[in-house]
């Protein structure tokens, strides 16, 4: 008689189907920050005041708008931040999600929490598990839904409302396992981000080397010899993708950034852009918003300028040329306007600029080298996205 051996894997988490629904205030304490007197604040001192800016995007940065006080009172010392405390920002912009950022403290030294932030301290739950719980979609949905208007377009979340949020938690043993796994994934994510940033720095250095050290025999031409401005208009009728422009490229608009509900004219015309066009925002060139269209046919805001690339240049080479910091700095000399936010570079001035261009053969060699680096960056980005997907699973 033969026996069939069936190997059943050990379940990492044994009771995930028995999650407990609890009130957030029953597993932690939440206290608001203190309204420190701005007149007592200095640029240097013994105790630093932690403001919302220090927690922006969930990244703890003490260098952002640093403020200090000396000799805090007994009352002020009640807001001293301790190891494993979780800080969260409570105030943001209406219809945006620029708040609700959380940071868990590691070895804080002489840090005091300012108003518009809250300090969350675990009482009946694993401290690291609580941190990840506060970053979950379930928590954030309740967080943003509970926000109420403040001054102007400001919105706030009440601590009393937060205390009544309902969350699901696992048993103590699984809390430790889950938090350890998520912590390990966070470390992988941070390492992966550093790898990508290092690759980008290497790429930029290589591009600068080509344009600054190898261009002595390149031909000087006006940008108008390379680019041709055009304006093709189209209404938004869902026959073509509506996209947005950034320094990182052209991407389809998401609901989060779609402000078309503010547009009253249903026949409003949008700019059409095609594959390999060069597009830029005249008012945001100072922020690097100039890019090549690698997405394909789409409509974009009519404030953007679109160019086709003439046959004497390779599209990717032109992209490398116009996205360099050195090029943007030269272009900004043509900025017009008195208000910084509205200062812009006209397309006619941009096209009048002189640039150095090599032969098509040299352009192709440069593009081939950068393509190798870009493929490396793309693969590293895919791995980063995989780690993030694994984390989202929890």
Residue ranges and their predicted role:
Residues 25-38, 53-86, 108-109, 224-275:
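Sequence-specific dsDNA recognition surfaces
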Residues 51-52, 65, 69-72, 76-135, ...:
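A short beta-sheet element
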Residues 1-6, 12-34, 164, 169-172, ...:
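Non-catalytic DNA-recognition/assembly elements of restriction-modification systems
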Residues 1-18, 184-187, 191-222, 382-394:
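Short amphipathic coiled-coil heptad-repeat segments
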Residues 110-116, 148-173, 283, 298-304, ...:
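A short glycine-rich beta-alpha junction/loop motif
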Residues 92, 181-183, 187, 284, ...:
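Short, surface-exposed secondary-structure boundary micro-motifs
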